[in-house]
Amino acid sequence: MAMMGQLWTNTGSALATLMFVYTIFKQFFPLFGPQLEPFLYRLFGRFYPYIQITFHEYSGEHFKRSEAYLGIQSYLSKDSSARAKKLKANTTKGSKSIVLSMDDKEEITDDFEGIRVWWQSKKEGATRQSFSFYPEANEKRYYMLRFHRRDREVIIERYLEHVMREGKTIEQKNRERKLYSNTPGQSHGNNSKWSHVTFEHPATFDTLAMEENKKEEIKSDLIKFSKSKDYYKKIGKAWKRGYLLFGPPGTGKSTMIAAMANFLEYDVYDLELTTVKDNTHLRRLLIETSAKSIIVIEDIDCSLNLTGQRKKKEEEEEDGDDKNTIEKKMMMKNEGENKESKVTLSGLLNFIDGLWSACGGERIIVFTTNFVDKLDPALIRKGRMDKHIEMSYCCFEAFKVLAKNYLDVEESEMFEEIKRLLEVEEIKMTPADVGENLLPKSEKEGGETCLKRLIEALKEEKEEAKKKVEEEEEEKQRKKEKVKEIEAEKEKKKKIEEEN
């Protein structure tokens, strides 16, 4: 027995010495490391009783974050603050408490059915360095699970399933809806191309200034979509739906998006096309969006050259080929910026309903525009933008919603006058302007004062509209007179030439 103990002691000492020598050798002769590592792994594997499993945040050629990694992250968060020695501290908006989580390069233990396992949070730096106007994170994160090889069957068959199930439960319990942005120049802390803040917009369909039947129609459409996973699979289409919101500024397009997100409890991705590098970058952004989300491109007419002024030859080609025939360069909001951007209309069309649009599911894509007539028909046809919603000027029903929201007033003698101005006189005022007039300017102002101010504003709008029409008529008349003068001058010259 003493001889056996001495043998193990000598073996341990020899292995320790060998590891020390290998570490020094690897430091001074790094080129030979890869050739020696397989041999050393086989050697130590005979004596090392533990198995390791690695879960990378991004694995292989996958663009999307690993669901296994995210599940483990949620699972370990429940008791890492009590077990880990190195913690990361963050604060949540609207709360004075500090949220603690497991720091990088930290280890905690976990017990399952009498078996102890070890979890490590690891991080590696990138081996290459490059300069780019579109910087990406230079670190790779992963979790490493270590357990005794005698417990292999239990860990693989039951423990990992337990971790994923519990992690998903914790994630759903703590889920906080987010507003994502792809604005460059922000530090994301990982490889994600999106940064986010908590989505806290209070808009709902109850507070939305719109006709009641129109709101009910939109809500029914959203409910039908959210429950149609099997139906979309049956008909062979990606589980997504496109909405086009169009109308003058101030008619509530952004508020509509917020109401949709709150109604469905979806995250919102605000996609700024002018900051996207190229079509590949656009696909990566799409892949990183989660299910149960709304992807928004606001003012789409300002992001791409979508005026529809295509050549006659292109208009005659079949619709199935429009992705190849209408490819155009991006129009920058500010010339001179983002000159490296190479996103094309073709790339955007593929983003909406091409092969890459099927990655994931349960997504709503929303375009907004002030000038729907300027958009290329190929972009907004059915199948891409399935539902077109006009966000128009304030009607009487929309006014009543605003009066309830702003003043908590449901009936007033002045309602009849406001109804006459909006419906009979057909005065055009946006919901934003109506709301501004209904907003009390001081604590002393009551509902009656605000309603009177709105009536005066509507009358002023009527006079301004009348004045504008008169000015347009005068301008038309001046143009007609100018044309007559030109024609008379031509006729005069013609007579002189004939006389000569």
UniProtKB/Swiss-Prot annotation:
Induction: By singlet oxygen (1)O(2).
Chain intervals for the UniProt region annotation (Disordered): 174-193, 462-500
Enzyme type, top EC level: hydrolase
Family: Belongs to the AAA ATPase family. BCS1 subfamily.
Main location: membrane
Molecular function per GO: ATP binding; ATP hydrolysis activity
Top-level taxon: Eukaryota
Assigned GO CC terms: endoplasmic reticulum; membrane
EC nos: 3.6.1.-
Polar residues bias spans: 180-193
Alphabetical UniProt keywords: ATP-binding, Hydrolase, Magnesium, Membrane, Nucleotide-binding, Transmembrane, Transmembrane helix
Pfam families: AAA, AAA_assoc
Protein name per Swiss-Prot or TrEMBL: AAA-ATPase At3g28580
Organism: Arabidopsis thaliana
SUPFAM superfamilies tied to this protein: P-loop containing nucleoside triphosphate hydrolases (SSF52540)
Cofactors that this protein relies on: Mg(2+)
